[in-house]
Amino acid sequence: YSAVFPFIKYAADLMVQKYHVDPKLAGTIPGLLPIGAIILTPLFGSLYDRIGKGATLMVIGSVMLIFVHSMFALPILNVWWFATVIMIVLGFAFSLVPSAMWPSVPKIIPEKQLGTAYALIFWVQNWGLMGVPLLIGWVLNSYCKGPVVDGAQTYDYTLPMTIFAMFGVLALIVALMLKAENKKKGYGLEEANIQK
């Protein structure tokens, strides 16, 4: 979540600064992400129920996060349509990971401790939702200022996007650890929830 929700806070400005999108339309491209999630998350959840592969889906989603933020960081194809395509891929990743992550929790944690487990997950997420925007804002102001153009400060988003990509790397490491632990302990993360 730290690679997505805090990113959305800065995404409209990224669209203006890097992709030269009209400021009046800059929120439209990041706005595709929640619209896509509304449609895709239930579909991916249903897919997980039918085929399983929860840890694998989390790995795939994490790789997609790394790819998206790396593409936003690289100085290539600085045009609106590329940003739109990359944002749609981010919507896929953002839908894929939670649709596999949340149903995996009761497979790992005993039922009598589920409340504590979910509370701890939200606690960690909220630290990220509080701290990551502060970190990105500090990085932008300290290391990424460009020239003032028409009275407005410009920013280079390469370093912040690299930081978001590193959160994707962290998510990938956790997903791979879950996959390995599942192999050892047989939690059933790769098994379908709907048994025929």
Feature locations, PLM:
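A membrane-interface helix-boundary motif in multi-pass transporters
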Residues: 138-168
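Multi-pass alpha-helical transporter architecture, strongest
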Residues: 73, 157-196
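Helix-to-loop junctions at the C-terminal end of transmembrane segments
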Residues: 40-53, 140
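A late C-terminal transmembrane helix in Major Facilitator Superfamily
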Residues: 111-145
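Juxtamembrane helix-start elements in MFS-like secondary transporters
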Residues: 21-30, 79, 83, 156-157
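C-terminal transmembrane helical hairpin of 12-TM major facilitator-type secondary transporters
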Residues: 54-101
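Extracytoplasmic gate region of multi-pass secondary transporters
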Residues: 1-41, 98, 102, 132-133
